[in-house]
Regions:
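Basic nucleic-acid-binding interfaces
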Residues: 87
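Short Cys/His-rich "knuckle" micro-motifs
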Residues: 43-50, 79-83
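Cys/His-coordinated zinc-binding microdomains
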Residues: 37, 51, 73
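Short beta-strand-alpha-helix junction that forms the catalytic/metal-binding core
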Residues: 31, 55-76
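Short cysteine-rich loop/turn motifs with clustered Cys
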Residues: 14-46, 69
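A boundary/linker detector
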Residues: 1-19, 24, 39, 102-137
């Protein structure tokens, strides 16, 4: 049975979160929370989003997802201090103009084709395998 585009898009989003956490990991597999700096193994981290995950224009943008500890991602994003820390980290890393562009994109709708999503999924899976091999080496 063919997966719906929504299901395929969700698979891509989950893979992107895994990729981002792996990419941020050091040789021992640890990465720092984007907002509080706490170091944990990449498998214990979550993929936190600057622009909430439901916004389609930014959902599959690598720049929108960063490692976050469970505390910051699940509970902290409800607190203004964590939201401000996330935005501050974004500005420090990408610059104010880029962050403002992303914030404008939050109100836009992007419809990805099945072909785009299947290619995206294959590409991100390849990148994940490469990073997993590097960590095992």
């Amino acid at each position: 049975m063919t997966k719906s585009i929504a299901a395929l898009r969700e698979e891509c989003a989950v893979l992107l979160q895994k990729y981002v956490r792996l990419k941020a990991a050091d040789s021992d597999g640890y990465c720092a929370c984007w907002t509080c700096g706490k170091a944990e193994h990449w498998k214990e981290m979550q993929g936190g989003h600057f622009i909430e995950r439901g916004k389609t224009a930014t959902k599959l943008m690598e720049e929108n997802v960063h490692p976050q500890c469970r505390s910051c991602n699940m509970y902290g994003m409800k607190k203004a201090s964590v939201v401000l820390a996330y935005r501050s980290a974004m500005v420090d890393f990408y610059g104010e103009d880029f962050v403002r562009d992303m914030e404008r994109m939050a109100s836009q709708v992007t419809k990805h084709s099945r072909q785009y999503l299947e290619e995206y999924k294959a590409d991100i899976k390849t990148k994940i395998k490469e990073l997993e091999c590097e960590l095992k080496a």
